From Swiss-Prot:
E.C. number(s) listed in UniProt: 2.7.7.3
Binding residues for substrate: 10, 42, 74, 88
HAMAP family cross-referenced by the UniProt entry: PPAT_bact (MF_00151)
Enzyme class name: transferase
Protein name: Phosphopantetheine adenylyltransferase
Reaction equation(s) it catalyzes: (R)-4'-phosphopantetheine + ATP + H(+) = 3'-dephospho-CoA + diphosphate
GO CC, alphabetical: cytoplasm
Keywords from the UniProt entry: ATP-binding, Coenzyme A biosynthesis, Cytoplasm, Magnesium, Nucleotide-binding, Nucleotidyltransferase, Transferase
Pathway entry: Cofactor biosynthesis; coenzyme A biosynthesis; CoA from (R)-pantothenate: step 4/5
Record keyword DNA-binding present: no
Amino acid sequence: MITKAIYPGTFDPITNGHLDLVTRASEMFSHVILAIADSSSKKPMFTLAERVILAKQVTAPLKNVEVLGFSELMAEFAKKHNANILVRGLRSVSDFEYEWQLANMNRHLMPKLESVFLMPSEKWSFISSSLVKEVARHGGDITPFLPAPVTKALMTKLA
């Protein structure tokens, strides 16, 4: 049986923490869609197309991972792609409160859609795309937190 999961997010940019979670999800499920949200409300630094390209580059070794952009409700995207599992990362208690609301709304919209929560590896538990961008803007070393192609793309954006 093929178990298809979706790991959604803005991924602006994709971090080593995200890569850790999608790698672990790829070991748990037959097929994983890394779904990149066209989130205009978050005012992303990278365009959707740029985020998709970067994610494809860094997930290329994961043969059962597909990278797609989306702009519809997650429940609709899941239906369209015949997926019934959402993978979400939980770094903190504050993440849990937000994710709990999302999981319940998604279940209301699509009753068979299950949310699976993964804890990041300890070394990535404090990393967020926003924090990494802030460190980069102030000249800090971001290389430990991002895959090399993403570091290069971020530094180019900030130049």
